[in-house]
Structures are given as C-alpha cells and as structure tokens.
C-alpha cells in the first residue's frame, strides 16, 4: 500500500443495472500468523529426512536451523550459529560458559562433504546440493513459497498458490471471478482528497490460473495519478505465457495498455514503482468520469489471453 494510503473496497458495476456504488473502506482482520497447510507450505525446518546424526550436529540449538561458517563453540564443545551467538550475548545457551571466539573447524569441514536436499522438496524440488550450495539455491528455488499478494495491508503469510488463493478468499475477503475479461467501475466521492489509496484487489480464474487486478491512487512526482495493473500468481517464466490489456475512456477518447502480467514474486510496490501498467492522470480520470469532475467514476475494462 502506498505510504499514508488506505485500503478501499473496489466496486464492480453490473452492465445490467447501470448503477454506481461508493467505494467502501475495507476493514479486514487478517491472521498473519495462520499456519500453512501440511503438504503445501507447511514444511520441515530444512527438508532433511535422515537418521544420520551428523545432521543433528549441524542444527543450531537456539534457532534449530542448519549452521553455516562461522560455526562457534564454547570451551565445552557446544556449538551454535553466528547469528545466535549475538542473540545469546556471547553466553553458551547449554552450559552458560562464555563463548569467546572459538570456531568449530572440524564440524565446518565435515559439512563440506555432505549433500543435502532442498528444504522445499515436499513442494516439488527434488535436487540434491553440496551442503554449502544449498542455501544459495533455496533463495531462488522456483518451488519456494510465495508471499501473499494482498496490497491493502502488510501480510506476512506465505504458501503455495492453492494455499494463498484460499487465504485471500477467507482471510482478506477478496472477490474471486471466473473468466478472462473484466469490466470494473471504480468510484470515489472525494478524489481530490485522496492522494494515496489502494483499492481491494480482485482475483480472476482464467486458463486454470489466477491473476490479481490492482488499482490505486498515488503521486507520480508532483502529479496525482491512478494506476491499474495485473499480477500473475506463479513464477515469472509462467507469467510470460500470458498477455493482458486494460482500457479506460469516454467522450470518444481512450487510453489502452497492453503488457505481460508480473509475477507475484515481484512485490506490489515494486510493480507500482516500475510503472508497469495503465497510468491515468487524475485530471484525465475525472474527465472520463463525466459530470462536474468532482467524483471518480472510472470504468476499467480488460482481458487476458494466452500467447501461443
């Protein structure tokens, strides 16, 4: 959400009624600590399923993650990772001795000989890596969990796509629609007073995949603008298989945007700041709205298609 903005309820106008509705503020309480589902995003600490005691030796007793150099030890041989050494204020959490700066070089050397699976193996990654290459791979693994794409508030929930779809529907109360075309009217009674705002996103089920439609108001330099854009619930390589168009207009004039939906791997803010979408200056948006230009009534139409 843009700094200082508010989450606004998007209004979708039915072609059969021709009625406009005022945008409502979305007040949704979200449990950001909601556990992920087993077998989807609920996974083990580091994806190692082995009875080998070496792996247990490499587990930090404080954070329970695998340890990477420098691995520290106290005079009695108890080990812990470098991050936790700072957290425990240089005191061994096992025996309470002062840690000092003793490295456990033997354990670091043993780790070099190990091959371990990706921590996301139960999400589909079955590759095996040298111990010290595993962490770098996991930062970019295509099977790693996605972050919730909701833009109306900060949400820390992660998971696979099916888990996030349920989360968006149940926890954020996001509207879900089937189809590859859309026709929305965004309404706001006091657009001149709203410099930063994020409307409630809508999720479309299209070609068996999910797409998030965003709409918001923010300042582009000194100019107030509105922006609409689409994000794909999947990886960037999959997103490139699709294209979409957005259009606004009235009085014989129109603005059209065509592009490729961005993956939700890219944050909402990153996409907005890159201006990768349909940008409508506020004066033009109010012109398209008609009337005395004191109320936003902006119709955004669009469609999604699959590239052959």
From Swiss-Prot:
InterPro entries: 7-in-absentia-prot_TRAF-dom, E3_ubiquitin-ligase_SINA, Sina-like_RING, TRAF-like, Znf_RING, Znf_RING/FYVE/PHD, Znf_SIAH. It comes from the Eukaryota. A zinc finger (RING-type) spans 60-96. Its EC number is 2.3.2.27. It is found in: Endosome, Multivesicular body; Cytoplasmic vesicle, Autophagosome. PROSITE patterns: ZF_RING_2, ZF_SIAH. GO terms for biological process: protein ubiquitination; regulation of autophagosome assembly; ubiquitin-dependent protein catabolic process. Its main location: other. SUPFAM superfamilies: RING/U-box (SSF57850), TRAF domain-like (SSF49599). The RING-type zinc finger domain is essential for ubiquitin ligase activity. Interacts with RAP2-2. Interacts with SINAT6. Interacts with ATG6 and TRAF1A. Interacts with WAV3. Interacts with FREE1. Interacts with ELC/VPS23A. This is E3 ubiquitin-protein ligase SINAT2.
């Amino acid at each position: 959400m843009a700094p200082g903005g508010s989450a606004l309820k998007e209004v979708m106008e039915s072609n059969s009624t021709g009625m406009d509705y005022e945008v409502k503020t979305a007040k949704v309480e979200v449990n950001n600590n909601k556990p992920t589902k087993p077998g989807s995003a609920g996974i083990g600490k580091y994806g190692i399923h082995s009875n080998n005691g070496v792996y247990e030796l490499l587990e930090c007793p404080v954070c329970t993650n695998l340890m990477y150099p420098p691995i520290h030890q106290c005079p009695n041989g108890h080990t812990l990772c470098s991050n936790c050494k700072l957290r425990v204020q240089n005191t061994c959490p096992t025996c309470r001795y002062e840690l000092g700066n003793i490295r456990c070089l033997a354990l670091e050397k043993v780790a070099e000989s190990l091959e371990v699976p990706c921590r996301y193996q139960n999400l589909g990654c079955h590759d095996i890596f040298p111990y010290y290459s595993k962490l770098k791979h996991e930062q970019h693994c295509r099977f790693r969990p996605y972050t919730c794409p909701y833009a109306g508030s900060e949400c820390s929930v992660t998971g696979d796509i099916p888990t996030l779809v349920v989360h968006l529907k149940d926890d954020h109360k996001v509207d879900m629609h089937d189809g590859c075309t859309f026709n929305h009217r965004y309404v706001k009674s006091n657009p001149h007073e709203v410099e930063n705002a994020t409307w409630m996103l809508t999720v479309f089920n299209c070609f068996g995949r999910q797409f998030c439609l965003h709409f918001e108001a923010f300042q582009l330099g000194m100019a107030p603008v509105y922006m609409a854009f689409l994000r794909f619930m999947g990886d960037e390589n999959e997103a490139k298989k699709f294209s979409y168009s957005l259009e606004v207009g009235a009085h014989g004039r129109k603005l059209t945007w065509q592009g490729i939906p961005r993956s939700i791997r890219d944050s909402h803010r990153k996409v907005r700041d890159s201006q990768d979408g349909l940008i409508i200056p506020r004066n033009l948006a109010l012109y398209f709205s008609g009337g005395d230009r004191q109320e936003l009534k902006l119709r955004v139409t669009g469609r999604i298609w699959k590239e052959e």
